[in-house]
Design a protein with these regions (language model features):
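Catalytic cores of nucleotide-sugar-dependent glycosyltransferases that transfer UDP/GDP/TDP-activated
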Residues: 1-91
Length: 91
């Protein structure tokens, strides 16, 4: 499968030091690649870039890891077979 993991774009992936969500996304990418999947990390705060990457990436699965971007879920849904949204922040 071709999988997109969408990060918040706050810090790089993998992070230099602390970055729990960023490290989790990195770990997911490594494990999924080891299982034979093609994985792309999209890590930008620019929602237009995210929409562009997903629209033209032809992904089977898109996993959004930042609930602040929830308003673009409807834009992403037509461009993948499965759309997953997770929140990792204790608001």
């Amino acid at each position: 499968m071709k999988i997109a993991l969408i990060g918040p774009g706050i810090m790089k992936i993998p992070p230099d030091r602390w970055g729990a969500v960023e490290m989790m996304i990195w770990d997911y990418a490594i494990i999924l690649k080891d299982l034979g999947h093609r994985v792309q990390i999209i890590n930008t705060p620019d929602k237009d870039v995210i929409k562009f990457e997903v629209e033209y990436g032809k992904f089977d699965v898109v996993h959004l890891h930042y609930d602040v971007f929830a308003d673009i879920l409807e834009d992403l849904a037509p461009h993948c077979k499965l759309l997953i949204a997770s929140t990792h922040y204790p608001y």
